[in-house]
A protein has these predicted regions:
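Solvent-exposed soluble domains appended to multi-pass membrane proteins
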Residues: 185-445
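Serine/threonine-rich low-complexity intrinsically disordered regions
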Residues: 2, 19, 31, 35-38, ...
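Solvent-exposed, charged interface segments at domain starts and junctions
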Residues: 87, 95-131, 168-186, 231-246, ...
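Membrane-interface segments at or immediately adjacent to transmembrane helices
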Residues: 85, 141-211, 219
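Transmembrane and membrane-interface helices of multi-pass
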Residues: 1-3, 11-12, 18-166
Length: 445
């Protein structure tokens, strides 16, 4: 009987122990699930914080380095070939934006863990709710600000408007005036519908001037400076034909799809703004606006020998495809020039060749071209490129601002080159076009 009583007590104790173990196990599971839930929430909000900080830092970095650019410009640059890009710009973004955003996000995690240990459960729960709300609100505000700053929604609306001119080699209409679908302010005259002829035609020298605008003129001539930084170019403009948006010296007003180098080249070359789908075509099918008829195509049909000369790499942003697929016979870029010439370190910059050296070599190329018959020599400068431009050994130290000295140097270089052209036998039968590719991206201007 005693044994049965003892056995019953043992069974009872075992049941109690089993119940306690189950309760303990359930409690541990709840704690584990709670910890897992908190970890997931912490991870989610850390990612949101990272995106938030990344957006903020990116906005600041882009504004400081490129000024008021738009979303399509950023997207086109990311999608198009980047060979020849100034690596200092890439490293600057990695360090100042990505790394800084990552470090601040890690500090956020440590801050949350510190508050969790120091605050009571009730206080921490309140802080967690308020913090989560604040994070979501700031993310929404960041997204709204980014859209307002870069016209992201407008870009997608713009992209939804289609035209075959970018990607099909065919006539779209046979009307005299063909409207380009994509911007109601643009009336596109299809060159396929126009008879272009002429026997006594001129040679063409077409020079894209990096980041040139009338800001650097004095107020008397249409700029904002007390002293004219471009006296030589001012005289050239006054003595020859110039086009302006005002009664003073000015120029074309840029619009969507024309405000960075390859976009400006494309719009001047084709009469059309650049769209991001062109970058997709380059990436997928290795082609650049096969549906457009360009200046290069027209001159090629009329027997011109055509050459492009640039101090950077021709592959950048698809420059080689734009010109070689539309009538040009040759491109001289930094790589091909290095094979033919040797350069000193003070003749090079982060993008390639200094402009003074480029103008020297341009004289050799034009002299050879002039012996072949009618020619189109196109070139692009680089020294005024953002954010600070590139000083060369000929740049004056006239102004306190480095950028103004570079523009003054450009004015002298271009004027000297024009003087050389005037001394050549082919000058009287040559049209020279000087045009800024886009407004400067340097923030102070």
């Amino acid at each position: 009987q005693k044994l049965s009583i003892i056995a019953a007590k043992i069974v009872h104790c075992a049941k109690i122990a089993r119940c306690q173990f189950l309760l303990f196990f359930i409690d541990k599971c709840e704690v584990s699930l709670l910890k897992k839930k908190n970890k997931i929430l912490l991870t989610v909000f850390t990612i949101i914080i990272f995106i938030n900080i990344l957006l903020l830092n990116s906005n600041i970095w882009i504004y400081n380095n490129f000024g008021n650019v738009k979303f399509q410009e950023i997207l086109f640059t990311l999608l198009s070939p980047t060979s020849g890009t100034d690596t200092s710009v890439i490293f600057s973004y990695i360090i100042r934006v990505i790394v800084v955003s990552f470090v601040l996000s890690i500090l956020f995690i440590f801050g949350v863990l510190y508050l969790r240990r120091k605050c009571s459960s009730k206080a921490f729960k309140y802080l967690k709710c308020m913090g989560s709300l604040l994070i979501v609100i700031t993310l929404i505000l960041s997204l709204l600000y980014t859209n307002n700053r870069y016209d992201v929604v407008a870009y997608f609306n713009y992209q939804s408007q289609k035209t075959t001119i970018y990607n099909k080699k065919k006539k779209v209409h046979k009307k005299k005036n063909t409207e380009y679908i994509g911007d109601s302010t643009i009336i596109y005259q299809n060159p396929e519908d126009v008879k272009i002829s002429g026997d006594n035609t001129n040679n063409l020298i077409y020079i894209y001037l990096e980041s040139f605008e009338n800001t650097f003129l004095d107020t008397e001539n249409g700029g904002i400076k007390n002293v004219n930084c471009l006296p030589e170019l001012t005289e050239l403009a006054k003595q020859n034909t110039n086009f302006s948006n005002t009664d003073q010296l000015g120029g074309a007003l840029p619009f969507t799809g024309t405000t960075w180098t390859i976009a400006s080249m494309t719009s001047q070359f084709t009469g059309l703004p650049l769209k991001v789908e062109v970058a997709n075509d380059m990436d997928q099918q290795n082609r650049f606006m096969p549906g457009a008829k360009t200046i290069g195509d027209i001159l090629n049909e009329n027997g011109y020998i055509q050459e492009l000369m640039i101090g950077s790499q021709k592959e950048f942003a698809g420059t080689d495809k734009l010109f070689l697929q539309h009538g040009f016979d040759k491109i001289c870029d930094i790589n091909s020039l290095k094979q033919e010439y040797s350069f000193k370190s003070n003749e090079l910059n982060q993008w390639g060749l200094d402009d003074y050296k480029l103008f020297e070599l341009a004289k050799n190329e034009i002299t050879q071209l002039a012996q072949t018959g009618k020619f189109n020599f196109t070139m692009a400068t680089i020294d005024c490129h953002m954010p600070k431009g590139f000083l060369c050994k000929y740049c004056p130290n006239t102004y306190e601002n480095r950028y103004e000295n570079i523009y003054a140097c450009q004015s002298k270089l271009i004027n000297s080159f024009i003087d050389w052209c005037k001394s050549q036998s082919w000058y009287e039968n040559t049209t020279i076009v000087l045009v800024g590719d886009h407004p400067t991206m340097a923030q102070q201007y």
